[in-house]
Amino acid sequence: MTVRPLPLAGAALRFAMSPSLHTAMRRIVLGAVLVAGAVMPQAAVAQGADGALQISWEVRNRFRLFREERDFLIHTETLRAGSILASEDALAVRSDGRGWARNTVGRLCIDPTGRISEPCTRDGVKESYLTPTEHPVTVRLAGAIPVGATCAWTFDDGDGPRQSTVDCAEPINFRARYGRPTTATVDVSSADAPQRVTTQIEVRDIFIAGLGDSIASGEGNPDKPVALSDDGFCFQSYLGGPANQYFRPGRANFKGARACEGGDTSGSGLRTWQLLGAQWLNPACHRSLYSYQTRAAIALASQYQHIAVTYLPLACTGATITEGLFGSQRARECLFTRNAVTCTGTVEAQLSQLRDALAAARRRQPSRQLDLVLLSVGANDIDFSGLVADVIVDGATERGLFRRTGVLGSLDDSRATLQRELPQRFARLREALKPLVGGDLAHVVYTSYGNPALTGGVPCPGGPAGFDIHPSFNADPGRLQRVAAYVQREFLPRLKDLALCDGGVLCRDPSSDRMTFVDQHQQAFADHGFCARSSSDPEFDKQCFSATGESFTSDIVAASSTPLTCGRGASEFRAYAPRARWIRDANDSYFAAMTYPQGVSSSALPADIHDATWGVLSAVYGGAIHPTAEGHAAMADAALPAMTNVLGLGGAEPSTIIREQLPLAPVRP
């Protein structure tokens, strides 16, 4: 079948399309052609730098979670400058610190409940997300192309050749069959001798799953941060009474009572309040596109033109190996929309979700394999959040209450779990993961944590700075130093032993039981803990987040209208502006997410949105002591080389190109 060239710069071919798919392709091909020249990486153009004609090709929109190519192109563009961290900073500046994901999150092949769209309409074409049968590809001739040359293209995937003749300066867009090679041949006709160039096009679709806890999920980095109001919102204290109330910035556009007195306790006020919250890729798990796992998968797709990445994010904030990976766990938030509330209260075990997805994929494509698992887990197992609470909760009333309810952790209990229980849990996890990755745990890339409490390589000094969002918070210097030392000297080294079967950790078959371990980012994190400050930090941070813990107006009359002592509005805070700290402090957690966790029975949480419990939870449940988007980007930079090595991608992608000088056509007398 011959396909006519488009009237603009490009042409499209279709292979074995249904009439409806053909119609959809015709709708998108114009836009695809217009951007084809822009998306070609510099390496592709450089292939013909020596003057020899070559066929250059790349998969379009090859991070398949994205429905629309424009969301992928912003990453390919900014990643050309170098690292994922540099890309994140560039995107942050471009968005004025509001974040690149705030628009992308609504254009994905997985919805906020975690349901995979099958099929998923990507750039106007319906595709199976888990089991693609074809991929969109752009092909062009590179090198010293003769002026005015005409290219006769032929594509053959075994079902007969498809042909199109266009100007050689124009790209060709077509959908390549998955699982079989397509032979691409171009005959170049010009005033010079005719030439023929041939290559094979075969897309490698890489299936990656992301597993783990809040570090893996991207906690602390909502895809669309909460919009805060510039006036104050009242919280009660556990001591009660007007004298113990305090004001902090509220949620923008909230029409209810801002004072503690007269608040709506019916429950409807809470629902209205929740509609104004931050938005996440998955609210139940505080799953975010800023997660290092997602950023590394995007970068992998950007770096290699001949692959596509099918990515399944399953990590969940609060997950342990026992509750989260093997068993169900409590959800962090419900999904609130204007028409409904989705709130099951629990999240299905990640390993169960992964097995189900693989089983569904193999029913359609029996040869479909899981190529890579990205994993970070273990911090919740040793109750790291309890250790953090023990460091920052300073008020006597709150400490007494939280000690009785088990919120405050202890180093002794954490150390006992690290030494006795965590090795057993890792052994069980290895046995569960091994059959999912073909029997070789090298395909599990375990990325360790950065120490969150260091600056200049030493523990942060402590104090209220970064934590004065709640009156009872104050990072105790002694407890902070002990926890930082425990993390650095005991927890992180033990995780490495567990992943690599070292340090006395017994594995059944060390040669196949060792995970691929990543910790190269830890040195950089030693200069970017939660207390790191720089003259280049955002002006809002420098003016409004006090180094002495005096960020908020203490007089409740004045605070009701001007809660910040700096006099600026909370709406000026930019969650994704570049800053020295790569770890969210409690102030960041509140200003970025202001989370009211709802993943439990409504009877277990107060209906009054001014209640003292919400005051504490909203300060920490949005990601206090978790990496920022920059921190996640640094982790992704560390993980990416390990991923490419395991996948055998290495450096430049191999390409077999055959060139022939064709005989000149005989001249007729």
Where are the model-predicted features located?
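Mobile gating loops/cap/lid regions near enzyme active sites that modulate substrate access
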Residues: 451-625
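Conserved SGNH/GDSL esterase-like catalytic core that processes O-acyl groups on lipids
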Residues: 232-420
